[in-house]
A protein has these predicted regions:
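Bacterial Sec-dependent N-terminal signal peptides
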Residues: 1-32, 42
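Non-catalytic accessory segments flanking enzyme active sites
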Residues: 59-139
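Short beta-strand/loop motif that positions the catalytic acidic residue
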Residues: 323-325
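Cap/lid segment of the alpha/beta-hydrolase catalytic domain
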Residues: 146-241, 247, 284-290
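Alpha/beta-hydrolase fold nucleophile elbow
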Residues: 244-256
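Glycine-rich nucleophile elbow surrounding the catalytic serine of serine-hydrolase chemistry
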Residues: 254-264
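Mobile cap/lid helix-loop segments that gate and shape the active-site cleft of serine hydrolases
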Residues: 214-218, 233, 272-313, 318, ...
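C-terminal catalytic histidine-bearing segment of alpha/beta-hydrolase fold enzymes
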Residues: 342-343, 348-382
Length: 382
């Protein structure tokens, strides 16, 4: 009985304290809980940091994936060449090559522009899509007997075929076309869809290269894909119709944007035997990082689905390739170019043909150093 009374007292005391606690809490609760916005700022900051870390991780993974996406077969040179097909398909698809409605090319106009003591010069229009023509200059040396090697010579940004052929003076080409025919090379210089500021071309309202590129990308191609088609198809037509061209010895070179087109056209076009891109070469990894830096306002054209410069060289391999850049080129960083050249050289080294790749530097700026280019072509196209 005594123990029961004690237990009852304890229960009563417990409920008394509980009632007092709840009463006090009820008295102290505000009508509405409030706090300053600044008190929750650490949470918002943490949310942003989490998203940034997530994006950084995905970016690094995408960069690594892109840098390692080209894996040809190194068992033998033949196996290597055979393994390039799917990569060329992917590269062509990235640029939208061939473009919609591409056709087998045909010459529309072939006109003599002039001649001098070394060559005869022709202007050529070749229809490559109905209503769309590849235009270029074809230079035929007068001292050839039988067949001669052909050099596809690509002008740079804001340029024209007349400049690289030296019909008028543009010093950074160093009279390339004229010097080539003096050495017995045929020259085919296709034109890109560009206006030339130094030629004082008039601006044509509504006709803009960048606008064309945006429109073509919506339609399954790009200005680059269209122009690669122009280069390849027009060269095919010349080869088929001009017996003076040695079809086993076709090379390609270009300056600046012409260097870009030299790399990627040769990567896609197996009949080009040797390539010498000049004044357009940079670190692909740095380019991919730039792609993710949307605050710059401009992004790399390569993106994660494309192929960097060293990978384009990998698709040129096992054919000979010389990449040229000037130590005083203000547009392309020499340190980045050296990094990229090392990556490119590994394709040749793994196949035991490292002598077929050359990273050629000179003391000039954003321009051709033609002696080295002719030395390279003399070695591989003769």
């Amino acid at each position: 009985m005594k123990n029961s009374i004690i237990r009852t007292k304890k229960v009563l005391i417990f409920f008394l304290f509980l009632f007092q606690y709840l009463f006090i809490c009820a008295q102290e609760l505000p009508e509405q809980y409030r706090e300053k916005f600044s008190e929750s700022f650490p949470i918002r900051k943490e949310q942003h940091l989490e998203v940034k870390a997530y994006i950084d991780q995905l970016t690094r993974e995408k960069i690594d994936e892109s840098m390692s996406s080209f894996n040809p077969d190194f068992i033998s040179i033949a196996d290597y060449e055979n393994s390039l097909y799917p990569y060329r398909q992917k590269l062509g698809s990235f640029f939208g090559y061939p473009p919609p409605k591409a056709i087998k090319g045909k010459v529309s106009r072939f006109e003599k522009a002039g001649e001098d003591k070394y060559c005869t010069i022709y202007r050529v229009w070749i229809e490559v899509i109905e209503g769309v023509h590849a235009y270029g200059i074809y230079m035929v040396p007068k001292n050839i007997e039988g067949k001669a090697p052909l050099i596809i010579a690509m002008h740079g940004g804001g340029g024209n075929p007349e400049a690289i052929c030296d019909l008028d003076t543009r010093v950074n080409y160093h009279s390339f076309g004229h010097e080539a025919v003096k050495k017995g090379y045929l020259v085919w210089a296709p034109g890109l869809t560009m206006l030339s500021g130094y030629a004082k071309d008039s601006i044509i309202s509504g006709l803009d290269r960048d606008l064309f590129d945006k429109q073509l990308k919506l339609l399954g191609s790009s200005i680059i894909g269209l122009e690669i088609h122009k280069i390849i198809e027009s060269t095919r037509v010349l080869i088929s119709e001009h017996p003076e061209i040695d079809i086993k010895n076709i090379g390609m070179t270009g300056l600046s944007w012409g260097g870009f087109f030299t790399m990627y056209t040769t990567a896609l076009c197996p009949f080009i035997k040797a390539a010498a891109p000049s004044a357009y070469f940079r670190d692909s990894e740095a380019d991919l990082i730039k792609t993710t830096n949307v605050t710059e306002g401009t992004q790399s054209i390569y993106q994660f689905k494309g192929f960097g410069h060293f990978q384009a060289i990998g698709m040129i391999c096992p054919r000979p390739c010389m990449v040229q850049i000037g130590e005083n080129d203000g547009l392309f960083d020499m340190n980045g170019a050296r990094i990229e050249a090392k990556r490119a050289s590994l394709f040749y080294e793994k196949l035991g043909i490292k002598d077929r790749f050359e990273f050629n530097t000179h003391t000039l700026g954003h321009e051709f150093e033609i002696e080295s280019i002719f030395r390279f072509f003399d070695q591989h196209l003769r």
